[in-house]
UniProtKB/Swiss-Prot annotation:
Protein name: Protein DOG1-like 4
GO terms, biological process: DNA-templated transcription
Deletion phenotype: No germination phenotype.
Positions of the DOG1 domain: 9-229
Signal peptide: none
Top-level taxon of the source organism: Eukaryota
GO molecular function, one term: sequence-specific DNA binding
Pfam families documented for this protein: DOG1
Length: 232
């Protein structure tokens, strides 16, 4: 049985479903651009800008929501179980996109030596940042595992005035630490995405963004289908 959603979860669920629908529309445009070699560089850059703006809008909405309830983003109700299972600190793992670039290189994307060097430097920097965040996150693993304490405070169950105050103070401290970690992880995601787009040419950016959007859309479809079959 699914847990009752709070207002933050309801609002972000509505936002995210709309955001994904728009992502699918942009994916369609990316695929047209990829298959149509007649588009100018200016047109490609305009399309790339629309995608980056769309991603920035997601993080703007996300950061506003986590200020109200960061715990809602761990085991998010707007994601299916497969999407949640693939999540790294409430989002995609930055180093994953380099494997995506590697697959594109093996298939059809040709990079010059300078691009390869810059990508490798960015890969090393991204991995370093990931590991730094993971070390910080270890401090919160024990507290995060005890969701019963969290739900007790959020549902307002009273087990004695002083005890409740202690629990609520612990949850506030936990939430502040988690918000810091989530924002740090999101910043690495955004820096990695920008870094890759700065290195690739406009046609390569279109192909990369199409691959990334396809993965996200297909993961959601597979997860929804699997969840529907399991619960039907």
């Amino acid at each position: 049985m699914s847990k009752m959603r709070n207002l933050v979860e309801e609002k972000f669920l509505e936002f995210y479903e709309s955001w994904v629908i728009q992502l699918e529309l942009y994916l369609h445009q990316l695929l047209i651009a990829h298959n149509n070699n007649t588009m100018s560089e200016t047109e490609l850059r305009h399309l790339i800008s629309k995608l980056t703006t769309h991603h920035k809008a997601y993080y703007t909405a996300k950061w506003a929501a986590i200020r109200e309830d960061v715990l809602a983003f761990f085991g998010s109700v707007w994601l299916n179980p497969l999407e949640n299972a693939c999540s790294w600190l409430t989002g995609w793992k930055p180093s994953m996109v380099f494997r995506m670039v590697d697959r594109l290189r093996k298939s059809r994307v040709v990079l010059v030596e300078a691009q390869v060097k810059k990508l490798e430097e960015l890969r090393v920097k991204t991995k370093f940042d990931e590991q730094k965040i993971e070390r910080e996150m270890e401090r919160y693993q024990v507290a995060m595992a005890d969701r019963k304490m969290v739900e007790l405070a959020r549902l307002g169950c009273h087990v004695g005035g002083e005890s409740v105050m202690v629990v609520e103070a612990a949850v506030r401290g936990l939430s502040m630490g988690l918000e810091k970690m989530v924002k740090a992880a999101d910043c690495v995601r955004l820096k990695t995405l920008k870094g890759i787009l700065d290195i690739l040419t406009p046609p390569q950016c279109v192909e990369f963004l199409a691959a990334a959007a396809t993965f996200q859309v297909q993961l959601r479809r597979w997860g929804n289908r699997r969840h529907y079959v399991t619960h039907s």
